[in-house]
Amino acid sequence: MKKVYFDNAATTRIDDSVLEEMNLVMKESYGNPSSTHGYGRESRVIIEKARKSIANEFNVQPSEIIFTSGGTESDNIVLMSAVQDLKVKTIITTEIEHHAVLNMVKHLKERHSVDIKFLKINNCGQISLKDLRNALDSVNSRVLVTLMHVNNEIGSIT
């Protein structure tokens, strides 16, 4: 029987060409890119080449591309930076947001007195755009909206 994978919102199979390149790099260019020895410099060149390639695809500067270890670290960096650097005072989200976001939002509320507004979701796991507009209109401070576009646990698409 042929298997079919339907959970691509959670994790997606790596393309064969990407996997081949990753294996080659991990076998032959495994130096710490922060080190000054030859292996480290070689790894740094590979990383910076990848950064430039991605930046070109998105028409941004390479310095705007940040590599992280995964989704949780990415969520934490964005949320913490929004509060500390951009002076966001209100975050609008939902109770079904990814736990990494919800945990950081809770932390920001407790430690930085950020106001959190939770939008209601319907029985399909979607928000009302009217509710979002009302929440935005009720805020007199800098605001960040964080909403999961595709929920891999319940299958909703917002």
Q: Could you describe each region identified by the protein language model?
A:
Residues 1-158:
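Pyridoxal 5′-phosphate
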